[in-house]
A protein has these predicted regions:
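Vicinal oxygen chelate
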Residues: 37, 50, 56-61, 82-92, ...
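Hydrophobic, proline/glycine-rich low-complexity stretches
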Residues: 2-18, 31
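Eukaryotic phosphotyrosine signaling hubs
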Residues: 8, 97-98
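Phosphate-end processing signature that detects enzymes handling 5′-triphosphorylated RNA
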Residues: 20, 24-27, 68, 150, ...
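Glycine/small-residue-rich interface belts in oligomeric ring/scaffold proteins
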Residues: 20-85
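Short, surface-exposed ligand-recognition loops at beta-strand->loop->(often short) alpha-helix junctions
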Residues: 13-15, 104-105, 181-188
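Short, conserved charged micro-motifs
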Residues: 20-23, 106-113, 188-193
Length: 229
């Protein structure tokens, strides 16, 4: 277990298109995500919604305008399992809360931590979007993080921002706050062990299920309690 507790950075809504994902969030929370931009390396793009306390919500989708690698090389797999046929089949039914991202705060160095524990933490990828740069743990095949074969979006991706400025600091206030992040997983004991090791167990309420893995986020909004799943 790490001695450094992680912080919740953001939640991830996956969608076939940004418009579909934006509409899903707006219909549920009463405010539409905006801003964001493109991730050239991953060939994805996003929109963001500010939440209380330095946390935000990300809607992410494959960017149909993304350029292929200039050197003719094969593009790398997209993050958050967006290239996975199972994910794409699910997105045909609509956007959903697919994942969450936990922040590694300095002085701890995400890259050094991953080098020390490569079986526990996926390879670190440098990312950019506009003026923001950061490091992100992304398996080479673009899958969700996993431990002993269990993941399914319930284990967090790890992020470390390169500058003190965080995206939430430049997003409009919404009056929306995350109340609780919950998950169910058929291998909850394996998931719990990895969350404990990461120092992230305090960020999510985990229960066992005989069914499929799933995430649920509860929000306090000006119109009352709302849920994304």
């Amino acid at each position: 277990m790490t001695a450094h507790s992680l912080r919740l950075d953001h939640l991830v809504i996956s969608a076939r298109t940004l418009d579909e994902g934006t509409q899903y969030v707006a219909d549920t929370l009463g405010v539409a995500p905006a801003g964001g931009g493109a991730h050239p390396l991953m060939r994805t793009h996003n929109r963001l919604l500010n939440l209380w306390g330095g946390v935000y919500l990300e809607v992410i989708a494959i960017d149909p305008q993304a350029a292929e690698p200039a050197d003719g090389a094969s593009p790398r797999a997209r993050l958050f399992a967006l290239d996975d046929p199972a994910t794409q089949a699910r997105l045909e039914k609509g956007p959903y809360l697919s994942h969450w991202v936990a922040r590694v705060e300095r002085p701890k160095q995400l890259g050094a931590w991953q080098t020390q524990y490569p079986q526990r933490i996926a390879p670190i990828v440098p990312m950019t979007r506009g003026d923001f740069t950061w490091s992100l743990s992304v398996p080479d095949d673009g899958a969700f993080p996993a431990w002993q074969g269990a993941g399914d979006g319930v284990l967090p991706t790890l992020i470390q921002w390169d500058t003190p400025k965080h995206p939430s600091a430049v997003l409009d206030e919404t009056g929306i706050a995350l109340k609780a992040l919950k998950a169910v997983h058929p291998q909850a004991d394996v998931i719990a062990a990895q969350l404990h090791w990461l120092g992230a167990a305090h960020l999510i309420a985990l229960e066992s299920t005989d069914g499929a893995a799933a995430l649920v986020a509860e929000f306090e909004t000006p119109e009352g309690l709302r849920t994304l799943k």
